[in-house]
């Protein structure tokens, strides 16, 4: 999926506003994913998955850091996320549908924390961004 110049601007502006809260929001989105889509828990048998878990927060920060990297490389997502794509496809073997689940929970989390800034245009741009990231992460599954 190609991000338009307006999409790129919306993604960058949103990520700038998120700033230091990215890790917190990543953890919250991951908690939402586990609560809303319990099958996603199967990839984390070694984690304490209770609400507020330090392990979930730490992994949520990793997710947020990867998205921050992606937001900084919107013109080369495959290059920026190549190692992460290899990891998810070849080692972790995460079912691609889980990226859609997490993307949805990220949108909900961001909208709940920034309702005024979460306009329909921003929502659409972030949805396209998360979809593009998901496409890159699943590109090496073939």
Curated annotation (Swiss-Prot):
Residues 2-142 form the Globin domain. The keyword Lipoprotein does not apply. The modification Phosphotyrosine is found at residue 25. Keywords: Acetylation, Heme, Iron, Metal-binding, Oxygen transport, Phosphoprotein, Transport. Red blood cells. Heme b binds at residue 88. InterPro entries: Globin, Globin-like_sf, Globin/Proto, Hemoglobin_a-typ, Hemoglobin_oxygen_transport, Hemoglobin_pi. The keyword Metal-binding applies. O2 binds at residue 59. The modification Phosphoserine is found at residues 4, 36, 50, 103, 125, 139. CDD domains: Hb-alpha-like. It comes from the Eukaryota. GO terms for biological process: hydrogen peroxide catabolic process. The modification N6-succinyllysine is found at residues 8, 12, 17, 41. The modification Phosphothreonine is found at residues 109, 135, 138. GO terms for cellular component: blood microparticle; haptoglobin-hemoglobin complex; hemoglobin complex. The modification N6-acetyllysine is found at residue 17. Belongs to the globin family. Heterotetramer of two alpha chains and two beta chains. This is Hemoglobin subunit alpha. The gene is HBA.
């Amino acid at each position: 999926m190609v991000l338009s110049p307006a999409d790129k601007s919306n993604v960058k502006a949103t990520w700038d506003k998120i700033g230091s809260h990215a890790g917190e929001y990543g953890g919250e989105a991951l908690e939402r994913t586990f609560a809303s889509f319990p099958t996603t828990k199967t990839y984390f048998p070694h984690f304490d998955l209770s609400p507020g878990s330090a392990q979930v927060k730490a992994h949520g920060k990793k997710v947020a850091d990867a998205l921050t990297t992606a937001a900084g490389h919107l013109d080369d997502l495959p290059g920026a996320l190549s190692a992460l794509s290899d990891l998810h496809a070849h080692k972790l073997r995460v079912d691609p549908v889980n990226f859609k689940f997490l993307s949805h929970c990220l949108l909900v989390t961001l909208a709940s924390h920034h309702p005024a800034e979460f306009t329909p245009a921003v929502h659409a741009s972030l949805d396209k961004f998360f979809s593009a990231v998901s496409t890159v992460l699943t590109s090496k599954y073939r």
